[in-house]
Amino acid sequence: MPLCSIAKRGKMSGKIEFPEPDEVLTAKPSIKKYLRYLLFFGPGAIIASVTIGQGQLILGPQIGAWAGYKLLWLITISFASYLIAYMGARFMLLSGISVIDLFAIKTRKGFLNWIFILIILIFLPLFVAAIVTTLGQSMAWIFGFGHYLIWGIATCVFAAILAIVGRYRVIEFSQAIFVAVLGIGAIVSVAMIKPDLMEIIPNYFMIGNTPSYPSWVMTEYPSLAEKPVPLLMLGYLGTLTVSLVTLVGYLGWVKVKKWGIFKEKENPDAFSHKLLERFKKTGKIDYLPDDEKEVKKAKILLKPLLLDLMLSFIIVAVVSSAYMIAGAKLLGHNIPSDINLLREQAVIFSSIAEWLRPLYQLSVFFALFGTVYGGFEAVSRMVYETGKDLSRKIERVEYRKFMFYMMIYMLATGIPLAILGYYGLSIILMLSITLLFIGVVGIVIYGIGTVYLGRKYLPEKYRMGKIWYAITILFLLLFVVPFFCFI
């Protein structure tokens, strides 16, 4: 069988032919069509669930309590990570080759891939420790008995087992449910607060506005006041982004979904590998058709990707805004501490109406459990996709087996740090530093590489327009604004 589907009777010898798009993508505009578009929401649900759970419930209300609405602009600039996620996945769905594979080939001994892997292996245990702590606290609070560490460790081990034995479709479906619960909870809470929108909306566009700690923070929370505001800003920005973990994991998930060039392919990984081998021989992507009909077809096949990421960003932005606004309106001087990260935030729901407390508890559980459950898959997929071109051993290992090894590493390193957190190590500080690297620094490096590769290697007809490249670069520049707040 040839490398891939070849155009009829050699009319485009050596060129592939893109598969036909789903009927819904080419149908005439209608309400039914746009409702069916929602069925494409899949990998983006994992991104949304993991993104919200990786720190929104912890840092969002806390920042809202002392900064008010002044840092809502961080949600705006987090859009940069979604643009980068789109560009990276777009490159792969058009060419069949992952940008991560090109990083391995085009940098000295896969230097960039090693940087990504080191960032994950060094900082991931801190993240696992934070999740073990917060998930354990939520479980102990919900059920009313038991030590939070026992709850946290047991629940994380249970989630790891589910992730190993479960199929990707189960993970995707469960994350969609988790996201629905979170979205409903956030919208209900803010709707009942009835905030002043005219006071809130301008803050989304006041890029660079850096508040100082109020005087009451200095006196009532001296340990918080010791932390530089820009560090907390960067940590919070990291909770909003498509992190380095989910950026690379997303490339694997869209292959599993068989979107774009992978549509109708029985083995997307093998197909991608063949195209990569061809690229290694020629040094260019010379197999994409020049025919305008094929180019148009290829771009229509990108619609599921665009819809998936758009829905993901909207959900994350809405939920993130809700928790910061609720923190500003309701928490007052009650900033959540390392010991009671979640319990003290129950006021966000219960002060509105006591019956909303269970909704908050349910939202917390789904957010954190969804992060652990989806996160185990995301981290394993990220390290696997990043490392398979660096090591033949990784490439030869069956993915489920590799995932099991990653689970052991994450639990064996994260649980001891969670225990140290019980003895005084700051969970919020651990989370902020971790998200700074996997949610900000890693994104900037990946983004620069993706923009460069897209312009250099995609044939001109398949590149994004110059305006979109300019917008992406602009948002990347805005993305580093919090770093300048240290000056």
Task: Name the predicted role of every residue range.
Residues 4-57, 271-281, 297-306, 310:
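Membrane-interface "cap" regions at the ends of multi-pass membrane proteins
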Residues 180-222, 243-252, 445-458, 482-487:
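Hydrophobic alpha-helical segments and their helix-loop junctions in multi-pass secondary transporters
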Residues 47, 74-106, 116-123, 127, ...:
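Juxtamembrane transmembrane-helix boundary signature
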